[in-house]
Structure formats: structure tokens, C-alpha cells
């Protein structure tokens, strides 16, 4: 995998992790309710779920691409529609990323890890996002090393982002800064997701 392609993957994974949603709300709840350790437990358990989705998506898409290019393109186009929808939602969001930062009830570290894992494994949004995203980074004949990179990148990026969130929530100064930049994060995410959707449609125009 080229550096340019990996950087594209990295940026999309980062924006995906930064997108406000139930995952952020869950990690936030456990951080504010149980402290830094609970937040980290939820964050990295969540990233393991992300890694699992990445693995099965890479494997499944590789098989589909090998057997049917038309079917793969259809999946890609459906994914493009979903990416465009996510981008639109981000651009039209009335509140920024900080709107999900709410306090929850105290829970054990084990419960924090469990909820962090389940919120990623049971989210249709995450499954659809990976189908849309990985259609751009999976290719027939891709080396095992490249596939490992594709799987590990979202896992590590997700874990590090929510680790950052956990640490930020321990500092009122940085929390306020994040609140102030929340709308900007939404807008950047929206533009990038819509741009990626347009790219997918362009690459699969012959099947329209």
C-alpha cells in the first residue's frame, strides 16, 4: 500500500472516529462517570470491535471483488450513497461534537469495556460505514501485509481518538476548546465524506 493511499485511509478513519454518535456518547459517559480508567476501558474495547469489523469487511469485500466486479461496484455505489448521507448529516448538524458530552451513572471497569465493545459490534452505522469505506482500499491480489495495515489502521486510530477524548474530559480547559471546535469538526467531516462519495460514484460510473 502506497503512503498516499494509507494517508487517505488514515484521514477517513480519523474523521469516522471523530464523528459524533453513540460511540462518543458511550465513551464519554463512562469517562465522566467512572474516571479515566473506565474511559480507556470503553475506548479500547470499542476499538477492538472496530478492528473486528475491519477484518471481516476486508475479507468479505476481497472475495466479492474477486468473484464479481459488478456486484462489488453495486456495493460501492450503495456505500457512496450512505457516505453522502453521513456527510449531509454532518454539514447540517445544529450542534457540534460536544453536544453528546453528558454525564452517566457510575459503572464498573468491566461494564465500561463491555458497553464499549457492544456499541461498536451492534451498530449498523459502523457496519455500513466500513462497507462504504473499504471498497476504496481492498483490491484483488493485495498483500497480506497491506490487509493487516488496512485492518489495524482503523483499530489504532479509533483507540487513540477515544483515548484523547478520555484525557480531554479530565481537563476543563481542553474540553471547552473541543466544544468551541465542535461545529468545525462536523463541517470538515461532512465535506470529506461527500467528496469520498463523489469519488466512488465517479470510479463506478460505468455501472450506473
Locate the predicted segments by residue.
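Juxtamembrane transmembrane-helix termini in multi-pass membrane transport proteins
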Residues: 3-73, 129-154, 163, 167
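Alpha-helical membrane-protein architecture signal
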Residues: 7, 11, 106-118, 148-149
Amino acid at each position: 500500500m502506497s503512503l498516499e493511499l494509507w494517508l487517505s485511509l488514515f484521514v477517513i478513519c480519523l474523521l469516522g472516529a471523530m464523528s459524533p454518535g453513540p460511540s462518543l456518547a458511550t465513551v464519554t459517559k463512562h469517562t465522566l462517570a467512572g474516571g479515566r480508567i473506565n474511559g480507556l476501558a470503553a475506548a479500547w474495547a470499542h476499538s477492538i470491535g472496530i478492528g473486528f469489523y475491519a477484518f471481516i469487511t476486508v475479507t468479505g469485500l476481497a472475495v466479492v471483488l474477486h468473484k464479481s466486479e459488478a456486484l462489488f461496484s453495486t456495493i460501492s455505489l450503495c456505500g457512496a450513497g450512505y457516505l453522502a448521507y453521513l456527510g449531509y448529516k454532518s454539514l447540517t448538524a445544529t450542534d457540534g461534537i460536544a453536544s453528546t458530552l453528558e454525564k452517566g451513572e457510575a459503572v464498573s471497569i468491566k461494564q465500561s469495556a463491555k458497553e464499549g465493545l457492544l456499541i461498536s459490534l451492534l451498530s449498523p452505522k459502523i457496519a455500513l460505514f466500513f462497507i462504504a469505506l473499504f471498497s476504496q482500499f481492498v483490491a484483488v491480489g493485495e498483500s497480506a501485509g497491506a490487509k493487516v495495515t488496512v485492518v489495524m489502521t482503523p483499530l489504532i486510530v479509533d483507540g487513540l481518538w477515544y483515548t484523547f477524548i478520555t484525557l480531554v474530559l479530565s481537563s476543563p480547559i481542553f474540553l471547552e476548546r473541543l466544544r468551541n471546535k465542535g461545529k468545525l469538526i462536523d463541517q470538515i467531516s461532512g465535506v470529506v465524506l461527500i467528496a469520498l462519495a463523489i469519488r466512488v460514484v465517479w470510479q463506478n460510473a460505468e455501472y450506473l
